[in-house]
Amino acid sequence: MTHAWSKQPIPYAVEVPDRAPKERYYSQEFFDLEAEQLWSRTWQMACRLEEIPEPGDFSVYEILDQSVIVIRGEDGEIRAMHNTCRHRGVKLATAPGNCAKEFVCPFHGWRYDQSGRNTKIPMRKSFAQHNLDADDVSLAPVQCDTWGGCVWINLDPEAPPLRESIEPAASILDAWKVEDLRVEWWYACRLPVNWKLAQQAFQEMYHVVVTHPQLVIAGMRYGAQHGEFDPKRFVDAEIQYLHTMSEGMAGMVHATDVAVAESIRDIDLPADPAAAMAAWYLVLNTAVVEHHRSLGHEVPDLVDLEAKGLAEPMGYVFPHYFVLPMYSSASSYRFRPVGPEVTIMEIWSMTRYPSDAERPRPVPPEIWPHDDPRWPPIPAQDFSNLPRQQLGLHSKAFEFMRLSQTGEGHLSNFERVLDGFLAGLPHDRLASALREVNVNPLERHVVDIEF
């Protein structure tokens, strides 16, 4: 259904697709508009299902000044509700836990069951009847759904269903069986930068050569273009890349998969570059799949994914969530604004286990500063750039970001979809634009965004 709407003015709007005004990344006015029109209307990853495995388990999701309880009920159903007592507004939960049967307000003892229904009001007769309506004194529900091993919430009760809001990323990542991934570790960082700057560092490949030079496979593919291809050197370079990614991310490419690659290092490959590369990936993908299936792991058919062009996806779900699967495992990122120039970034390293394996319940991590020496090398390199960028944007000589039409196309597309939300466009006018950004950001050019 098409709704009547009146476009609202946007401060510092993107008027030229490849130029983003600098004020978008530090203006309080712009930040407040995002809180009102973006974060109140979009689907957000609230927690992993692993965080609430048992009846009564709950997690607390915070976005700006809004707090949401996500709970698995005794009936197995997952619900979300605003984390505020209906009496005088006290937060009911400040950390994840298990509520057994009910939530109790620590101030005056109002009680709520796992569905949010009010079960007790002390001195009930002292309240006027108009303050005791059953719906009014129950916790306000929040729209929620599950996908990809996570619970998602949307503060807008009129928002369209989750699945249609996160395509085509959902279908692509379903092929990778991301719902079967389980957490190995979960880290969090407090970055002194705007949330958009923080995540845009992971939405383009343009920076890799300078920021992450260790990731550049230096001779092999270049040599192949000049008639210097050597299958042995190619395999050595590929395995070195896997080691570098695995060690640099403390995951993503799992050490188990690197070991599988090492076990086939000495295979014979054709002299023709294209044939050798195809043969290597076929053997490697087959070996990884066979290894994990022998252990009882639910792992996708990597050979089939390669044939379908899905072998190296980077799933992005607007506005704040990434999944980066590689071979058996993956990393995922979530970004949440704290202030115009402060962001919490979280990283999960995930891999596969037998379906009946017992895993510890993930708990929210300590939030590390961006320059903490415990960060793995690759995110540490990104974190070193970001505070300098945030400071540089305040220069009186700098007006706007100049974006590459190809290498940074997703940044432009993202910013213009954001403007659609900030203009107050209804969900049905935003649907097609969302499909342009719920994709692998590394492969996007600047595209026409139509509302």
Pin down the residues of each PLM region.
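C-terminal catalytic domain of Rieske-type non-heme iron oxygenases
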Residues: 72, 77, 143-146, 150-451
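Rieske [2Fe-2S] iron-sulfur-binding domain
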Residues: 51-157, 161-175
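General detector of N-terminal leader/presequence modules that precede the first folded domain
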Residues: 1-10, 373
